[in-house]
Amino acid sequence: MKREDVLMEALPYIQQFHGQIFVIKLGGHAMVDQLVLEAAIRDVVLLSYIGISVVLVHGGGPEITDKMKAMGKEPKFVGGLRITDQETLEIAQMVLVGKINDGIVSLIAKCGARGVGISGNDGSLLIAKRKELQVVTIEDRTERVDLGHVGEIVEVDPAILQMLLSNEYIPVVAPIAIDRESNSLNINADTAAAKIAVALHAAKLINLTDVDGVMDAERTHVYRRLKVDETNEMINSGVISEGMIPKVEGMVYALDRGVGSAHIINGNTEHNLLLELFTRDGVGTMIHP
């Protein structure tokens, strides 16, 4: 395709998306390669330049695990769920807020835009409660496990995000929330992104991760478009499994509450974000009502 054809294909999408809000979740695994992350941030800055308001929500699971090991603390998982004691929470805050969040804001500045790093604590953006005991299966037996300082979001106050967006900043949100007693809690970034998208009445919820999208049972084909009902059936049948389940469930939650569409994109490939948004066929999976 000629360069001018690429630009002309993008034009109607640019016109359609101008003035809309996109919430983009940067997956922890998709951020391991610094060059790939820089490319993703350049794409995000481009979106802001053409009139799209972007809120970034980032994860950081792999970096938290690496930091814990470097500090001599072995991460604890039960049934695939991280146990977060007080020391682990402090390490998570150090990594999420002090390292990853600051790094993304610096990259935004490097690309000529203005980013502001916040966590769910700031402006009471994300209010959470401590998760109840979780039922997990261990060696064919079920146990009830206390995950520690892990929360589930019960309320979102988007005022701080609206203020930043109205002043043309790109908010960068770390997945730490606060409870009613002002205690910090670690939260799932996919869930945070979904709930923020709903609170902002976002047009799109986008997940940049390390897979190409929702795949079939044989893992040979990527579904380009799916309806919510289809994703529910695929979860029940096991086609959507493991780490993809919370991503898709978060998107279904958002779509059921007014978000226009949701996208799962491989963030490890440069400019996939732009190709998904501004070409007819896209490169990932779009989920819609």
From Swiss-Prot:
Naturally occurring in which organism (per UniProt): Methanosphaerula palustris (strain ATCC BAA-1556 / DSM 19958 / E1-9c)
Cellular localisation: Cytoplasm
Enzymatic class: transferase
MF-aspect GO terms: acetylglutamate kinase activity; ATP binding
Gene: argB
InterPro entries listed in its UniProt record: AceGlu_kinase-like_sf, AcgluKinase_fam, ArgB, Asp/Glu/Uridylate_kinase, Glu/AcGlu_kinase, NAGK-C
Marked site (Transition state stabilizer) residue numbers: 25, 247
Enzyme Commission number(s) of this protein: 2.7.2.8
Record's protein name: Acetylglutamate kinase
Similarity section: Belongs to the acetylglutamate kinase family. ArgB subfamily.
Keyword Amino-acid biosynthesis: yes
PANTHER family for the chain: N-ACETYLGLUTAMATE SYNTHASE, N-ACETYLGLUTAMATE SYNTHASE, MITOCHONDRIAL
Reactions performed catalytically: N-acetyl-L-glutamate + ATP = N-acetyl-L-glutamyl 5-phosphate + ADP
Keyword annotations from UniProtKB, A to Z: Amino-acid biosynthesis, Arginine biosynthesis, ATP-binding, Cytoplasm, Kinase, Nucleotide-binding, Transferase
Source superkingdom: Archaea
Signal peptide per UniProt: none
This protein's pathway: Amino-acid biosynthesis; L-arginine biosynthesis; N(2)-acetyl-L-ornithine from L-glutamate: step 2/4
Listed GO CC annotations: cytoplasm
UniProt: substrate binding residues: 60-61, 82, 186
Residue ranges of the TM segments: none
Single biological process term from Gene Ontology: L-arginine biosynthetic process
